Amino acid sequence: MDRISGLPDELLLRVLSLLPNVKDVVVTMVLSKRWQFLWMMVPKLVYDDSYQNLEYGKFSRFVDRSLFMRKAPGIETLHFKLGQNCGNGDIQWWIRAASKFCFRELIIEINCSTSASPSILPRSLYTECRMLVTLKLKKAVLVDVSSPTCFPSLKNLSLVSVKYPGNEFVKSLLSSCHVLEDLVVEQCINDNVTIFSVKVPSLKSLVLRTSKERAPDGESGFVVEAPSLEYLDIDQTGGFCVIENGMPNLAEAYVSVLHHHPVKFLSSITSVKRLYLCLLPHSILSCMQDMYPIRCVFHRLVHITLCTCDDEWLNLLACLLKGSPKLISLKLEKHHGHLICSPSPLRDDLSSVPECVLSSLETVEWVDYEGTEAERQLVEFILRNGSCLKKFVISPESVNPDKKYEMI
């Protein structure tokens, strides 16, 4: 212990920050005089009211005392994990008490499964957290404020299963984040938002998800205007997603959607370099009908991962190959397992070989290959015409040796 106690404060504080809870950090004060006040300067504070099944009244008083006794001038991370009996007044007081330490990261997670009533975050969140760089909220309720919100330093924002006052509040909240670069949104049911509008010029990374519990609704969806976006991840089982004014810097996109007209969305991300695509059942036919003769050309696309969970995926692939002249790498995988019958045969006989197959395609990986007649035709087509092909890896769906032999 003497050797450890002799280490510099900076290193000891870093070690204490790795402990899972402030309560564990405070216990170290009994180790020696060297440690007696060290806990008051730890830059990362994690308060978990479910930790060691502590009675909430004791937990609340512990948070009050530890914040009151804190010595260090700054807090890097303030993290609350709250559940049953969490009081709205407590959250308000804790945010105000900690605001004098200019904390840069605030995380509030509410366990709604045990909470008797929704935890409403205080108005002070918008007025006393101007130094925040990262804000992560989970299963909380935001309230409207009369004065404009402002997060001048906020770069990272995560809103998971959060409930809002309405559409206009979301617009106001995001417009107040002038340097926001990373946004995560996971919509829950009854979140009071029909159209979730994301119009942030500085945004570089965007993750949009809708809860599986939300019923598909053609009247609800996302509107995105993010000209600086480089990374997009969208998982949406209904509604719409409109991209306004393009995203010329988009490098990577993960798209798993169920849209009636997905080609309108795909035509908005044609600048992407790497694309993971899963069009859920009933979307692919619509996509193919719209994609040609209205041609979707991905001029910068070098890698595609295509999910084979729908029986029309082969025809979608044919469209993508024709519209991706610089494609280098192709991966096929069944991620969602929706397919219950063999893939439909190609409607396009591919009599004209796509440019990428002739001049750029180098690698093909096929996971869960079933060896159907249509799939064999595709393999033969690529092997016969792939002038630049260097590697073709096939992983059969079946592990049975006899079935594997039949696939050849």
Swiss-Prot record:
Ranges annotated as spanning the membrane: none
Domain FBD: from-to ranges: 345-408
SMART domains xrefs: FBD
Cross-referenced Pfam families: F-box, FBD, LRR_At5g56370
Occurrences of domain F-box (ranges): 1-54
Alphabetical list of InterPro entries matching this protein: F-box-like_dom_sf, F-box_dom, FBD, FBL13/AtMIF1-like, LRR_dom_sf, LRR_FXL15/At3g58940/PEG3-like
Domain of life from the UniProt record: Eukaryota
Name of the featured protein: Putative FBD-associated F-box protein At5g50270
Lineage of the organism: Eukaryota, Viridiplantae, Streptophyta, Embryophyta, Tracheophyta
